[in-house]
Amino acid sequence: MEAVRGPIRAVGRVALAAMFISGGADALLEPGPRTAKAEELGVPLDPELAVQANGAAMLVAGAALALGIRPRLAAAVLAGSLVPTTLAGHPYWQVEDPAARRQQRIHFFKNVGLFGGALLVLSERPRARRRRPPRRRTASG
């Protein structure tokens, strides 16, 4: 089982990162729809800049997670970005229309699942760095 654990983790990280990469790129390149929500919440920065900064963080951390570059740090950034995004972006309990409320609830709990996935990555033990064997010196070198 140990031989399969590495590839399973790698595939899992890529699958988890996909939503962050996609959503982050979308927020970075087309912040418009999210900007109004940021304005409503009274974000202290320029709302468009705040949305784009959050999108950039999700994109970069998602890519790092997918590539296995500092996955625990990437997961921490992603988990941290999910809390305000989820609470601000999907407050289903405030929506009157039943169909819209159902959609917002789905997105809210999808984000809760992504948060859980990020916590699982955070809970992994750090990989042991492989040490290269010492180089042998030859008489000529």
What is each stretch, according to the model?
Residues 1-141:
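Short amphipathic, positively biased membrane-proximal segments
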